[in-house]
Every structure is written in structure tokens, then in C-alpha cells.
Amino acid sequence: MLILDRILGQASDPALADRLHDLSHAGQVETLSLSGSDIQRHRLRLASDRGTDCAIRLERHQQLRNGSVLMLDSQRAIVVQMQDQHYLDLLPRDSAAALELGYFAGNMHWAVRFAGDTLQIPLNGPEADYLERLAPMLADGRVRRA
């Protein structure tokens, strides 16, 4: 098992980009594909796209991002790649429904983002689980899917 305990930088950093470019032409850049929830973790174990068994053990002040370089030497590199995040888009009927939806999402500890009047909830599990919890608001029209 390969222990990765620090972030060396971002793949977009000019100092790292040239080295990564050369290694990628040689087929020596491995990726760790992380979900939106996994990218927030500081400790996890997973396999790279080439099958390397990796254990990420970061200090609390370090935060993974898409493109985080966790290993870089003359032979290979390991880079984090964030998986596409899917969202449940919800449109409240009015300001009262918006407040209720926001309050509910907060109580559920759901992360949210906004796109105009639409509240977007990142899906970290089956969409049906989210819809089941929102069923009363969807059924009476306080909230609809956007």
C-alpha cells in the first residue's frame, strides 16, 4: 500500500505542469477518482486507475481538490480527479417555501448551492432517497423539480 500524506500542489501549477506533461506522454500519470463527498475526506483508501493501492492520510488543514498532486517523482505521478457531481434541482413556489426548503436542507445537513431561484443539492447517494424525504413538499406543490 502506498501512503500519500501530503499535497504537493495542483496539476495546473506551472512548476508541476511540465513534469506531469512529460510523465503523461510516457503513460506514467495515475489518477485517483474521487466523489464529491470523498474529496472532502482527509483519510481514505482506494485504488488508482492503474490498480495501485493507495491510502490518503492528510492533515486537517490540507484539502483535496480536483487536480491535487499527491505523488510526483521521475517514474510516475498520482493526481486526484473529481468525478462529475450530479445535483437535484429544486424550485420553491414562493419565499415561504424557499425558507422552509432551506431550513429542511440544513436540518438534513445537505450541502446546497444556488443557481438563480433554484436550490441545488449535490447527490451523495440515490436520488430516490432525497426525493422520499422531500415528498411532502413536492406533493403539495411547495417545491417542484426544476
Swiss-Prot record:
SMART domains: UreE_N (SM00988). It comes from the Bacteria. GO terms for cellular component: cytoplasm. It is found in: Cytoplasm. Keywords: Chaperone, Cytoplasm, Nickel, Nickel insertion. One of its GO terms (molecular function) is unfolded protein binding. InterPro entries: UreE, UreE_N, UreE_N_sf. GO terms for biological process: protein folding. It holds the Pfam family UreE_N. Involved in urease metallocenter assembly. Binds nickel. Probably functions as a nickel donor during metallocenter assembly. Belongs to the UreE family. This is Urease accessory protein UreE 1. The gene is ureE1.
